C-alpha cells in the first residue's frame, strides 16, 4: 500500500478547513444552544431547590401552628374543666349554705314553738294554780287529797295540750 502524500495532505487540509467552518458556523451556535439549555436546567434546579426550601419552611410553619393549636386546645379544655369544677364547688357551697340556712330557720321555728308552748303551759299552770288555790280554799284538804287533786289537774292540763 502506497500512501500518496499529496492526497493525504489535501484531505487533511480539507478536514481542517471543514473543522474551522464547522466550529465558526455550526459549533458556536450549537455550543450556545447547549449552554442556554444547561443554564435553563440550572435555573430549574435552583428554582426547584428554592421551592423545596420554601415548602420545608411552610411545612415547619404549619407544624408550629398545629402545635400552637394543640396547646391552645389543651389550655381551653383545662380552663373548661377548672371552670366546671369551680362551678360545681360553688353549687355545692351554695347548697350547703342553703341547707344551713334552712336548718337554722327550722331551729329558730322550733325554739319559737317551744317558747310559745312554754308560755301557754305557764298560763295553764297559773290558771290551774288559781283553780287549785280556789278549791283548797273552798275545802280543807289533807296531803293525800291535795296530791290527788294536783294529779287530776295535771292530767287535765296534759289532755288540753
From Swiss-Prot:
<dbReference type="InterPro" id="IPR028987">
    <property type="entry name" value="ATP_synth_B-like_membr_sf"/>
</dbReference>
<comment type="function">
    <text>Component of the F(0) channel, it forms part of the peripheral stalk, linking F(1) to F(0).</text>
</comment>
<comment type="subunit">
    <text>F-type ATPases have 2 components, F(1) - the catalytic core - and F(0) - the membrane proton channel. F(1) has five subunits: alpha(3), beta(3), gamma(1), delta(1), epsilon(1). F(0) has three main subunits: a(1), b(2) and c(10-14). The alpha and beta chains form an alternating ring which encloses part of the gamma chain. F(1) is attached to F(0) by a central stalk formed by the gamma and epsilon chains, while a peripheral stalk is formed by the delta and b chains.</text>
</comment>
<keyword id="KW-0813">Transport</keyword>
<comment type="function">
    <text>F(1)F(0) ATP synthase produces ATP from ADP in the presence of a proton or sodium gradient. F-type ATPases consist of two structural domains, F(1) containing the extramembraneous catalytic core and F(0) containing the membrane proton channel, linked together by a central stalk and a peripheral stalk. During catalysis, ATP synthesis in the catalytic domain of F(1) is coupled via a rotary mechanism of the central stalk subunits to proton translocation.</text>
</comment>
<dbReference type="InterPro" id="IPR005864">
    <property type="entry name" value="ATP_synth_F0_bsu_bac"/>
</dbReference>
<feature type="transmembrane region" description="Helical">
    <location>
        <begin position="2"/>
        <end position="22"/>
    </location>
</feature>
<dbReference type="GO" id="GO:0005886">
    <property type="term" value="C:plasma membrane"/>
</dbReference>
<keyword id="KW-0472">Membrane</keyword>
<keyword id="KW-0406">Ion transport</keyword>
<protein>
    <recommendedName>
        <fullName>ATP synthase subunit b</fullName>
    </recommendedName>
</protein>
<dbReference type="GO" id="GO:0045259">
    <property type="term" value="C:proton-transporting ATP synthase complex"/>
</dbReference>
<dbReference type="GO" id="GO:0046961">
    <property type="term" value="F:proton-transporting ATPase activity, rotational mechanism"/>
</dbReference>
<dbReference type="Pfam" id="PF00430">
    <property type="entry name" value="ATP-synt_B"/>
</dbReference>
<keyword id="KW-0138">CF(0)</keyword>
<dbReference type="InterPro" id="IPR002146">
    <property type="entry name" value="ATP_synth_b/b'su_bac/chlpt"/>
</dbReference>
<keyword id="KW-1003">Cell membrane</keyword>
<comment type="similarity">
    <text>Belongs to the ATPase B chain family.</text>
</comment>
<dbReference type="InterPro" id="IPR050059">
    <property type="entry name" value="ATP_synthase_B_chain"/>
</dbReference>
<keyword id="KW-0375">Hydrogen ion transport</keyword>
<dbReference type="GO" id="GO:0046933">
    <property type="term" value="F:proton-transporting ATP synthase activity, rotational mechanism"/>
</dbReference>
<keyword id="KW-0812">Transmembrane</keyword>
<keyword id="KW-0066">ATP synthesis</keyword>
<keyword id="KW-1133">Transmembrane helix</keyword>
